């Protein structure tokens, strides 16, 4: 009897269990997702922190999934702590290293010396491990959470329908525009504070809907996408509006930064976020060269 050899893949969205995994991700994003209050005293520094994370990820050739996970950890940690200004950059870097340990190959995990141009050279590995431990303890060591990028990889496989390629000569052009636009909207979703309050699967579905609408594909929300995502078109209107508004305000004529890869090297079991915690101070040594601010 011939063996049924199946193609092996490290991408969960290409496996026969993709539907089950997607349902699992959606279940836990709803049950365990924290409430985001946008109340960090350093929230005005968020654009700089996100830009720094992207820059390091580009240098280390990290995936888009890793970037989204790092920003997610940073957002919720900042929202629940009164961080000193001179520790916030180190916290963002620690979130990136934790994300890399989950989503990336060990060789791509950034080293502390990567940040020497931003933080003090006096920062030791011991100090840095303490910061990482603070973050892990806050999330109760559950830091592999579903992000927009995780869901996007699954939804992208269901983006097109047969009627989209009525004119076959434009198929390659359409696919190229699709890939660039998806990445652009993902970047835009990272920049929006208001979108943090939405479930990642809803933001990802809104990116797909907005992209199809922008490309002029009819219908812009297909029955297949409705079935796969579990969302009706009307469910995504508000999220699409916020996404489009953010693109208009911040991404006009800005080249797409394709420095990091579009997908994760493989699926990691999503770890559940801890429940909402009481706001607290973080006790980290003064190890960053910048002006100290009061709690």
Which residue ranges define each predicted feature?
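Acidic, serine/threonine-rich low-complexity regulatory regions at protein termini
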Residues: 1-295
